[in-house]
Amino acid sequence: MFKGILLCVLFAVLSANPLSQPEGFADEERDVRGLASFLGKALKAGLKNDDDVNERDVRGFASFLGKALKAALKIGANALGGAPQQREANDERRFADDEDDVNERDVRGFGSFLGKALKAALKIGANALGGAPQQR
């Protein structure tokens, strides 16, 4: 019986595909390793007064800084309202209909807002009256 279980587990392990990681994760990990290597060699060079900093490490550090700057700019652009093309597309969609027309999406959004506000008001009222029946 144990041989059968062992063989099944062995077969499952041998036939399983390794989990692949997204490419972005591997690139970030490689950049962090490159940064650590660069800083270590720079520290070692500073202590020994020897310039053995590798050009590959310098390029890796520059790549890391470039990606960090690109990510920071993307976050900043999204915080300010998205990319210019996205803002223009949103403006066109917003003003495509007549101003007096009521959009179904707006109605659903307002209904959702009212539902959440009513639920929150009921919860606050229940807590003000002594809590929910389960808490008494």
From Swiss-Prot:
A GO CC term assigned to this protein in UniProt: extracellular region
GO biological process terms on file: antimicrobial peptide biosynthetic process; innate immune response
Record's signal peptide: 1-26
Superkingdom of origin organism: Eukaryota
Region (Disordered): 82-101
Subcellular localization, as worded in the UniProt entry: Secreted
Propeptide: 27-136
Tissue: Expressed by the skin glands.
Presence of keyword Iron: no
Record keywords, A-Z: Amphibian defense peptide, Cleavage on pair of basic residues, Secreted, Signal
Entry similarity comment: Belongs to the gastrin/cholecystokinin family.
Function, in words: The pharmacological activities of caerulein are quite similar to the physiological activities of gastrin and related peptides.
Protein name (database record): Preprocaerulein type I'
Species of origin: Xenopus laevis
